[in-house]
């Protein structure tokens, strides 16, 4: 009897134990599809990004026109560029749904997997930010100026830090060059950390909607979940292509069709939609340092999720109070996203402040209390 090469070859057996014979819970729903979709997004973004880098010039006198050249003169350049830009939006849609699933079903109790995942989110945000600067349009330039300027709020070393990042006394050629370097480098760091994320996940196996131990009922990943993931992938690509081919500039900013001009500030400086919730939290605090800390904490609060879990049950599936708070959190994040795109005037300022307070209250205070109350209700 010959042994199966898939199970003996040093490389093949790693792939086999990760994607073929991997024991998976039989009851994981479509909410567990987003991990593979994020992997697909990463591959797509890397491929389109490399092709764009072949034609892009990271110099302030050439950047804007090189992007115009890509969309006009390069074979399918318009498609590659629009897929890359909208692929970033899709990437964030998937990661936000993936994190939402993690919070709802208590996946954060796999601490190592959760912490590597949160670090991946931070790296992704950094990559998207430096990437947005590269076309060197008005919003690219002013977005870079405003966000890097936030570091000047750091006590004592703030101004030095900002000038160090800029490579001069303003956002200039040196800034664009280093941002291009980071935008090229970070995705490969993300790939490496993704492998660590998977390694930690496969130490414990997947969680499932009930939150109960699923060791008694496991099925092989292939063919069951490989085909389920394939369906998700087809739907995601259909959505991406529809967005790219019918409305490629829907999520972009019209100001970015104007070349960067340090002498003219756009009336409303705002980031891409996927950063608006954090931007609204930043703006809702009148103090600069306070705003920067709140901005950081709005993401870093995810690292605290495992510590703040008080319930005897893992998932929110059978916890009505936590369910109410979870959906309130989602609604509140949508409100913050809307506020982030509005001008700084009443009533938007007040709404933003209320929503910011609620964001932290739900995660840090109300959810742990709800967990404790639900424990009492069980006894």
Swiss-Prot record:
Cofactor annotation: heme b
CDD domains xref list: cytochrome_b_C (cd00290), Cytochrome_b_N (cd00284)
Principal location: mitochondrion
KW ATP-binding (keyword) present: no
InterPro entries attached to this UniProt entry: Cyt_b/b6_C, Cyt_b/b6_C_sf, Cyt_b/b6_N, Cytb/b6-like_sf, Cytochrome_b, Cytochrome_b_C_euk/bac, Cytochrome_b_N_euk/bac, Di-haem_cyt_TM
Secretion signal span: none
Binding site for a ubiquinone: 202
TM stretches of this protein: 34-54, 78-99, 114-134, 179-199, 227-247, 289-309, 321-341, 348-368
Other comment: Heme 1 (or BL or b562) is low-potential and absorbs at about 562 nm, and heme 2 (or BH or b566) is high-potential and absorbs at about 566 nm.
Similarity comment: Belongs to the cytochrome b family.
Subunit composition and interactions: The cytochrome bc1 complex contains 3 respiratory subunits (MT-CYB, CYC1 and UQCRFS1), 2 core proteins (UQCRC1 and UQCRC2) and probably 6 low-molecular weight proteins.
Protein name: Cytochrome b
Protein species of origin: Emys orbicularis
